[in-house]
From Swiss-Prot:
Cu(+) 2 binds at C164, C167. Expressed in root pericycle cells, xylem region of diffuse vascular bundles in the first node, and vascular tissues of peduncle, rachis and husk. Residues 32-63 are annotated as: Disordered. It comes from the Eukaryota. GO terms for biological process: detoxification of copper ion; transmembrane transport. Copper (Cu) transporter that plays an essential role in promoting translocation of Cu from roots to shoots. Involved in loading Cu to the xylem of the roots and other organs, including panicles. It comes from Oryza sativa subsp. japonica (Rice). This is Copper-transporting ATPase HMA5.
Amino acid sequence: MAASTRALFLSCFHGSGGGGGTSEVSRRLVLRPRYPSMPRRPRSAAVAGEGGEGGGGGGDGDLEAAAVGAEEEEKVAVFEVSGMTCAACAGSVEKAVKRLQGIHDAAVDVLGGRAQVVFYPAFVSEEKIRETIQDVGFEAKLIDEEVKEKNILVCRLHIKGMTCTSCASTVESILQVVPGVQRASVALATEEAEIRYDRRIVTASQLTHAVEETGFEAILITTGDDQSRIDLKVDGTLNERSIMIVKSSVQALPGVEDIKVDPELHKITISYKPDQTGPRDLIEVIESAASGDLTVSIYPEADGRQQHRHGEIKRYRQSFLWSLVFTIPVFLTSMVFMYIPGLKDGLEKKVINMMSIGELLRWILSTPVQFVIGRRFYTGAYKALSHGSSNMDVLIALGTNTAYFYSVYSILRAASSHNYMATDFFETSSMLISFILLGKYLEILAKGKTSEAIAKLMDLAPETATMLIYDHEGNVVGEKEIDSRLIQKNDVIKVVPGGKVASDGFVIWGQSHVNESMITGESRPVAKRKGDTVIGGTVNENGVLHVRATFVGSESALAQIVRLVESAQMAKAPVQKFADQISRVFVPLVIILSLLTWLAWFLAGRLHGYPNSWIPSSMDSFQLALQFGISVMVIACPCALGLATPTAVMVATGVGASQGVLIKGGQALESAQKVDCIVFDKTGTLTIGKPVVVNTRLLKNMVLREFYAYVAAAEVNSEHPLGKAVVEHAKKFHSEESHVWTEARDFISVTGHGVKAKISGRAVMVGNKSFMLTSGIDIPVEALEILTEEEEKAQTAIIVAMDQEVVGIISVSDPIKPNAREVISYLKSMKVESIMVTGDNWGTANAISKEVGIENTVAEAKPEQKAEKVKELQSAGRTVAMVGDGINDSPALVSADVGLAIGAGTDVAIEAADIVLMKSNLEDVITAIDLSRKTFFRIRMNYVWALGYNIIGIPIAAGVLFPSTRFRLPPWVAGAAMAASSVSVVCWSLLLRYYKSPKLGR
């Protein structure tokens, strides 16, 4: 019955394609079948490469043509469907699902209660499929899914012109509705967008165009598929013929995926597979094809983001200085010269009826500030309003224009009247713009500091490298200095003392110590000799090294770290939603409050709600009310709220990276600061993860050198980790550098028990207790006592016998890390409970937990049981972090609120972990928790300041203190306060740059 059920289940998934037995169906299920039908796409969806840059055009035939060859690049979801009783039920479910757009295929198994759906996630979601099944009348639950993401890419855009959270929200919402976009995130602090998209539906250039249509300028940083891309500069004439020759020659090279030639910029962009070709090969082919007419070099590298940042700083500085040229005279004529008798008379001299020279002069001087220097605020306001949103620019434009145009109205009325005395606020609009420009200038300077960590990482790579040249016999015949970007895989690079390692690779000659602190955070130089790996960007301290390049360019560890930190700085913390929600209503609310403030004061003045003595001599009730209204409009600051979280996250992720703690974004930071329970794996986490010999007991009259010569000769052929540990230890007693051991004859290895061999005429056996007993060897009482003693200490005892007699016992252990006990103790002082979960036996587990000070231990746990323990703790209301090596701990790392992969080294792209600890140092666990807590303290203080500033500042600007103290906040002072609030938030976050990790023992 079971066999027939399985056959029916498999045949159900096989569909009606016919043919094939059960084994063929099984193979298809494992390999994800290629179904005969074409994927159906929405008719409105644009397909990349069809219909020009806009991506339009084409009917269903075009859409199907675009899908050819993409059948295997889909998402596969399996649903548990309950309630089906017959084939008709299965047929109705299958028919309903297949009717959805974006479904590749669907198969339903009525006996197993399963439905497998192959679909394109850009067009339909798992939730939509589940709802469709339920609409048919059955309960459905998603139980498994797999994505084949060859066509799913992530591109990054640098976006110019965003001034506040509202701008970022506008761009984000526009990107999220572009067909083919799965996810879009826009960060104001970094002025970048990260977009996950399906390249079959939309291109990176179309995404750039979508942003530019919102009124912002977008610069493509990376398309997601250009990890092996190079830009080459061409000196010489690029005509149609030479371009054709270059293209055909380059495309003939194995590994070349794409080539684009820009004759105007004299630039060639090539995408290639670094395993098959490299930049030097490409340059050589181009120059050879052009017969010497073209000279090719690496295109000057330029960081668009840094260039934009410097350009923005320069523009704001120039704008501010130019504004001062006009604003200072306006301020002097309205605030200072009016109190100097001689100057006052001259300024009050009438030129047209009641219009004075001073008023005319202020109008002339303030106009360039309002419309030329302040043009950026009009542009920003227009962009926001045209997309149905509002931002800080709207408030500034409204506030300054209200002051300016009322002043224009007032002096024009005076010019046409013989008795009207004008009152102008030209100094208000001019000084407002000047102070806001100053604030923006300081804010951009400060924001630039938040991304210094990435800039420093990128600067670690040396500009040049010394490449060794070999002859056909493998002898070094010369060396050549090349641009480090021209290094190809398998090149041999010479690294001199004090020089930087130019590429990831391994040492093929020489020995030295290398300072890796700038990459891993490891403070002590690491010894390197033949066979050891080195990391690009690290510093060689003493000896000369010859390094064979393995990972170059974007594949290097340094490039991976930079990408990870950049991605982390884009990821929003959940607490950021609070600021996003406020920003949606902030500006409209402030405008309403401003109007209500003006109306309340104006009506109170007209209805004699306050004494006339409250009104300054130079104003009337309307003008007093207007000043209060403008002050409310310009003091309100949504920018401080918008910058509170991302600036702190940016600095924290950069600081963490500099210490070898790679935090994957705001979500990880926010979860880590709540952790009150940490689950530790044992092997490789609390212990060093490598067995070492800790003790040797000789039971016969032998010297250690002779003893280990026999043992190593027997174990040298063993693949067991304990055998390797014994051989490594034996090298200490062996004088020959090559460590050539005596040849073993009649070698026999019994898996899990031991080895035996004939060495120099003696029968040598190395293994455990059972191996000796089954081999007929008597174990003396003294040896049995040692075995019991070692087991109690969680150490493995290896018995050595020669010629049927036990001659010694070797104790091997995976020792705990030197600071493990101190780390557990420190975590306890941080109110964090430590739990050990291991797959090892209870005896070893209890011994280790006792040694490090952990009270709660779970032993003999499989990987899935580790995850269950994490979930059990979470169900009890605990916030759980899991610390493991990222290999067999993946289920638990994923299940935990925060997964920390320790000892990752240069393998920083561990998907299961939220935080990657590059070193094997347990202190970094404390650093990760402590840094997250201090970061969120900063974030909370930022919010307290930003909210407190607005809650207190807006009422003061509205004149709440005026009745009792006659204190009022002039609009230009309110504007200065607004500018200062944003700067203060960024500066408060910048203090995280001076973070020092806790030191044990303090």
